[in-house]
Amino acid sequence: MQDFLRQQLERYAQRLEELNFLLSREDIMGDMKQYRAISREHADVTAIAGRYARHRQREADLAAAQDMLSDPDMADMAQEEIASAEAELVQLEDELQRLLLPKDPDDARNAYLEIRAGTGGDESALFAGDLARMYTRHCDAVGWKVEIMSANESELGGYKEVVLRVEGTDVYGRLRFESGGHRVQRVPATETQGRIHTSACTVAVMPEPDETQAITLNPADLRIDTFRASGAGGQHINKTDSAVRVVHLPTGIVAECQDGRSQHSNKAKALQVLQARLQEKERSEREAKEAALRKGLIGSGDRSDRIRTYNFPQGRLTDHRINLTIYKLLAVMEGDLGDVLDALQAAREAELLAELQVNN
């Protein structure tokens, strides 16, 4: 194990003793907010300290087995123990490196998934619908709950824009690298010559704001419009102005909702989406400054970055950020995204580990 990792892990053992003492104090037990915060840190530190204790134990076992090699009667047993200890130490070191990686507190949050049709007209809108279906099926498969916050349908099906709210465990951390430009190459249903067309959609994944950290909206900064909800092709689907559009005047950011049963419900949903978009704007600006100092492998998550190509004639999906190509596109479009998300997460962890080594 590298020295800088061992030094960090030693600090976790010391911190665990401090946290055990803090959790025993009456003043902290009486402050529920502080007690919960310390309890969360205690759980994280306990996991790391426990694995490090196991690592040290296996190092001691390895040293003892190596000492036994000189005894002819014990040599065979010692060889078995050495092989077992070395294999487990490799596994433990890999696990500890991952546990030490910096965590983004937003990773545990629910998320808003915004899909917009881009270049390609009707075909782009159809592909936006396919992406929404792909993500919804994946969420269903992993036990996440999906709610449509707003949807602007196109005449031939699909969406000009759709916003989904995804609720579950570690949603944002798992889906965050889906942000960017998604390009599709296929023969559209309306194509009579059999020619392959290229179109594109953009995806933005935004963490749902925490109530304590949500941006406070000044009513004077908002313009709230009501209008009749409409379906595909623009036809009105009710006779009351229940749909709501909220404009944040200082930034020009807009959110609208027409899927709820009442104007009150639609306004509440539109304000939720607006808060998420404003928070994401702040986050993007902050990360853009950091990205100017270092260019990450996976990219900034900017919706203008082309991140992935879906080639239907070849049954191929290519993620350009990590040079990943897989030939099971139909399964992916049915929601089988696990391999892609795992590869992106592994690339990000490798990137963070490299930064950790440089900084130490």
UniProtKB/Swiss-Prot annotation:
Q: Which GO terms describe its cellular component?
A: cytoplasm
- Name the family: Belongs to the prokaryotic/mitochondrial release factor family.
Q: What domain of life does the UniProt record list for this protein's source?
A: Bacteria
Classify the main location: cytoplasm
InterPro entries with a match to the protein in the record? PCRF (IPR005139), Pep_chain_release_fac_I (IPR000352), Pep_chain_release_fac_I_sf (IPR045853), Prokaryotic/Mito_RF (IPR050057), RF-1 (IPR004373)
Where does it reside?
Answer: Cytoplasm
Sorted alphabetically, which SUPFAM superfamilies does this protein's record hold?
Release factor
Q: Which organism is it from?
A: Delftia acidovorans (strain DSM 14801 / SPH-1)
Q: Which Pfam families match?
A: PCRF (PF03462), RF-1 (PF00472)
Give the UniProt keywords, A-Z.
Cytoplasm, Methylation, Protein biosynthesis
Q: Which GO terms describe its molecular function?
A: translation release factor activity, codon specific
Extract the PROSITE patterns matched here: RF_PROK_I
Modified residue N5-methylglutamine is at which positions?
Q235
Task: Tell me what PTMs the record reports for this protein.
Answer: Methylated by PrmC. Methylation increases the termination efficiency of RF1.
Function (record text): Peptide chain release factor 1 directs the termination of translation in response to the peptide chain termination codons UAG and UAA.
Q: What is this protein called?
A: Peptide chain release factor 1
